[in-house]
Amino acid sequence: MQSVTEGLEVSDMIKRILSGCLVIGIVAAMIGFQFIFPYSLNIIMALITATAVFELVSAVGLRKYLTFLLPSVAFALAIPLIPNQMYWSMVTYFLYTIFMLGSTIYHYKKVKFQDICVVYGMTLLVTTALNTVSLMRYLNPQHCMLYVVMALFAAWIADAGAYFVGSFIGKHKLCPNISPKKTVEGAVGGFIINIGLIMLMGYLYNLIFYGSQLSVSYLSLAIIGGVTAILSIVGDLSFSIIKRSYDVKDFGNLIPGHGGMMDRFDSVVIVGPFIYVNK
């Protein structure tokens, strides 16, 4: 029985590695295409956000109610496509709220108010937070893609580091009631790995694009690496609570070994805004 379990764990690890490589390839292509068609980042983030919200609504159990599903997905799709447009963004927020309130009244006897609140609140959070990744390209044309890469990989490196370290030496459970596989050793390992790789990312960016001519604060990068590692865990555990509450293992199965789009971007929901405000 133990060998079977170990075999399944190895298989899951291989799936995670292969899927992770695919995601990295997609991000690399996204970065390259960004220089040809800058608006491509907004389109990609809109599709990612809409998919994540669709999975979220499905997990809560409201997918069959189109009056909740369609406005939520449409809102998630629209916001990244109208960045830096405060007026139209506010109109979109207002219309989404009106649709959700109207749907709540219409389905009052059929749907739990708690479920509606989860869908509405998390749709606002996920959409607004992931939209910060789209907004990063307006911050500084010279370094905007570094911010985007850092927002994505700071979350993923910490998660991957924690997973692999925890898989090999993890003994003490971090939050067994929320995420049984997460360990203290994994969290510490992810923290250290994230700091090291974020500093390496800054070094390579300076070396490749500027011939080491920029003045890089490695202390700042180390702090960013440490803080984002912690925020990554917070994001992961927060969305794990939702999955636990609705008795689902993953939000979806779009990415083998990782789950759905929401599973892959749950940490980015917290890390993205941090990178954006600390640009």
Regions picked out by a protein language model, each given a short descriptive name:
Residues V227-L231, N253:
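Transmembrane alpha-helix interface/packing and boundary motifs in multi-pass membrane proteins
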Residues R244-D266:
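Interfacial loop-to-transmembrane junctions
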Residues F68, G252, V269-I270:
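Hydrophobic alpha-helical transmembrane segments of integral membrane proteins
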